[in-house]
Regions:
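Conserved H-loop
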Residues: 1-6, 9-15, 35-36
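Hydrophobic Walker B segment
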Residues: 14-17, 49
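Short, glycine/charged-rich "phosphate-handling" switch motifs in NTP-dependent
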Residues: 19, 31-32, 40
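Catalytic metal- and UDP-sugar-binding loop of GT-A-like glycosyltransferases, i.e.
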Residues: 22-23, 91
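Conserved ABC ATPase "signature" C-loop
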Residues: 25-27
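Short acidic-hydrophobic catalytic motif
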Residues: 35-39, 47
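Non-catalytic connector elements of ABC transporters
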Residues: 53-57, 65-168
């Protein structure tokens, strides 16, 4: 039995459906399982719509083998082919990691807010004017509000978008 159920509620859609069609502006932008929609959103709308909070996005420029993310230089990971020009880097709050030390693949950030949600903590960080949400792993010590930290933005769950569509 095939059933088409229309909803604007992501939780409802992901709970009832084996396969979800996500539409925006009258166009289907991704069809897939809940896991596929969450892990590799094919469109920035899907990344924002699926998940709570939605995916973080950072304006990024790719030039040569380097990235400029909010004015900070980040080297493109080995083997990752990105189109030149303006991109968006997308990463979910669950996959961002906070460090006190600058490392490859990190961006400098300032902690603006720490929320204790009960089972986890949500940290809001400012990366050159763009606010990012970081969901801390259980038992992780939260940084203090005002602290300068580094966010690991490059990893296996990082997505890159050009013209709102997934390119890497």
């Amino acid at each position: 039995l095939t059933l088409i159920y229309v909803t604007h509620d992501q939780v409802e859609a992901l709970t009832f459906a084996e396969e979800v069609v996500v539409m925006t502006r009258g166009k289907a932008v991704q069809v897939g399982s809940a896991e596929a929609l969450f892990e590799r959103p094919a469109h920035t709308f899907v990344g924002h719509f699926i998940g709570s909070p939605g995916m973080n996005f950072l304006p990024t420029q790719a030039v040569g083998g380097d990235l400029s993310v909010q004015g900070q230089a980040v080297q493109v990971p080995q083997g990752l082919a990105l189109p030149e020009g303006d991109l968006k880097l997308g990463i979910r709050p669950e996959y961002l990691a906070v460090s006190e030390v600058a490392e490859a693949g990190t961006l400098a950030a300032s902690v603006r807010q720490v929320q204790d949600i009960g089972t986890y903590q949500m940290v809001t960080c400012d990366v050159a004017g763009v606010m990012l949400k970081v969901r801390l792993a259980p038992q992780t010590q939260a940084p203090q509000v005002g602290a300068q930290v580094f966010l690991r933005v490059l990893g296996p769950h990082t997505c890159f978008y050009k013209n709102e569509e997934l390119v890497a």
